[in-house]
Each structure stands twice: as C-alpha cells, then as structure tokens.
C-alpha cells in the first residue's frame, strides 16, 4: 500500500505513516486478545467443549471491537489533535484527517479478524489464519485500491470498456477500510462453519495413549 500512497504526495505518505502508527495501538490490543483467545479455544477443545470454545471467540471479538469502536470514535471526533501529536505540518494534518475519518471506523474490523484468527490458531487450524491475512491485503485491499484511487481506462476485446473511479488518495483509504470489513465478513462466516472444532481434538485422539 505504501507504494500506492507514494504516487500521490509527500504529505499523503507522512499522513499514512502516522495513521499506521495510530492503528498499531489497535493491533497491539487485538493481538494480545487474540493470543488469549487461542489459549481459551485450545483448552476448551482439549476438554471436548467446542461450544464453549466458540463462546470464547465471540465474546472476545465483541469486547475487542467495542473498545476499538470507542477509540475510533474519539479519533474521528478529534482527528487533527490525533495527527498533531506527531507533526504540526498543516498539509500532513489535512491528509491525516481524511485518513482517520475513513479508516479509523474500520479498526474494529481489523481487530475482530485478529481475534478470530487467534481462535483458528488455538484450534490448530493455522492455515485459515494465514488465508485471512492474504484475503485482507491481496484480494480485498489491493484490487479495490486500484479501482478506487487511480484513473485508468481499459477496453476489453469486444469493445467493453472498464474505467477506474479515480478518487485519488481517498480511494486508498477506502480500500484499506474495505479490506478490513471484507476480511471480517469472511472470517465470521468461516468460523461459523465450525470446521475448526475438530482441530485439536482430532489430533489428540489420533495419538495413542502411552502404556507403562
């Protein structure tokens, strides 16, 4: 995403860097909760109580998202103050305000995905957690950024013309938010399938008990 931002302005690059630093607070919170969630899921699957494992994930996700929505509300209400903590350049603050107003409300969805990823890891289904990260960046964020931010036109064989929207740097911010929301929807749907419930239990059941 940094390479895309660099095609606009120095102020946009600086604002993006500051915005990511502010976002790192949400990642820290979500990462810690995700680790705790992984432990809870592993323990409950190990004791053959998958429903309680699911409850751990949903409650942890809801609590994390509530905290991050509250934090985002403060940042959206006072975006200039949040950016001003790091820099006093008017152009950067202006770009940063745009970034925060668009991206900050999606912090909760980033956090929700990280907690659900913790649930998958606790169940021993680590590949799903990796796939969710891939989806967020390469399936949702980057393609949406190419369509929203840039002004290209492409004509397909047969005469069908495709055109990007050309929203500029704001298109990148919307793509960032879209990646969070899209990956969260997929994460929730995948987790609700329940295919993870046999992860730890099956692996333990297949291991022969030691004999004396």
What are these regions (language model features)?
Residues 31-34, 103-122, 128-137, 144, ...:
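Short runs within selected transmembrane alpha-helices of multi-pass transporters and secretion channels
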Residues 15-77, 110-129:
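Small-residue-rich hydrophobic transmembrane alpha-helices
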Residues 41-106, 152-212:
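Short alpha-helical transmembrane segments in multi-pass integral membrane proteins
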Residues 1-7, 80-81, 121-133, 204-212:
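Alpha-helical membrane-embedding segments
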Residues 4-24, 91-97, 125:
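Interfacial/gating helices of multi-pass transporter permease domains
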Residues 2, 28, 75, 144-145, ...:
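Structural signal for membrane-spanning alpha-helices in multi-pass inner-membrane proteins
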Residues 114, 140-159:
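Transmembrane alpha-helical segments of integral membrane proteins
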